[in-house]
């Protein structure tokens, strides 16, 4: 799994956000965007692929879609579907780091005592507390 890494000294640029709500049979269109997309599942399952790797986004889960990578629905949803989406840009200094790279970076921060002024966001995962995402 990859992890988005960027300096927090350079803020991310918010573009737009919304809440998709669909009653039945939603299938995400095929796109290749120039910005990041953060998805947060609220209800139902979104069946989406990125570069032909299939994912299922369920309630309480998040996923980061990468710029310059094709994403699309690989199957229609069944029943009610709701998820939040947020489009944002990062500065040119962002990196996509694998798990071992993240571990090494965090260990070096602990040893050096330097300030931890970075954003780290895995490409997918589960929210620890879903109370805030179901506003």
Question: Where are the regions a protein language model picked out?
Answer:
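A hydrophobic/aromatic-rich effector-binding and dimerization subdomain
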Residues: 2-19, 70-135
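Histidine-centered metal-chelating micro-motifs
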Residues: 24, 45-47, 63, 67-73
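Aromatic-acidic/polar surface patches that form glycan- and anion
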Residues: 30-31, 56, 128-133
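Residues that flank catalytic or metal-binding motifs in active/ligand-binding sites
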Residues: 34, 67, 82
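Short beta-strand segments
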Residues: 39, 64-65, 85-89
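Short acidic-glycine-tyrosine-enriched beta hairpin
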Residues: 52-67
């Amino acid at each position: 799994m990859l992890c988005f890494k960027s300096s927090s000294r350079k803020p991310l640029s918010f573009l737009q956000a919304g809440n998709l709500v669909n009653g039945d049979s939603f299938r995400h269109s095929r796109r290749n965007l120039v910005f990041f997309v953060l998805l947060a599942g609220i209800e139902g399952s979104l069946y989406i692929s990125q570069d032909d790797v299939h994912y299922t986004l369920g309630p309480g889960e998040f996923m980061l879609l990468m710029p310059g990578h094709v994403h699309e629905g690989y199957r229609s949803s069944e029943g009610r579907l709701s998820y939040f989406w947020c489009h944002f840009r990062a500065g040119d200094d962002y990196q996509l780091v694998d798990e071992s790279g993240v571990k090494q970076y965090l260990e070096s921060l602990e040893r050096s005592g330097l300030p931890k002024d970075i954003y780290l966001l895995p490409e997918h995962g589960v929210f620890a507390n879903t109370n805030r995402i179901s506003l």
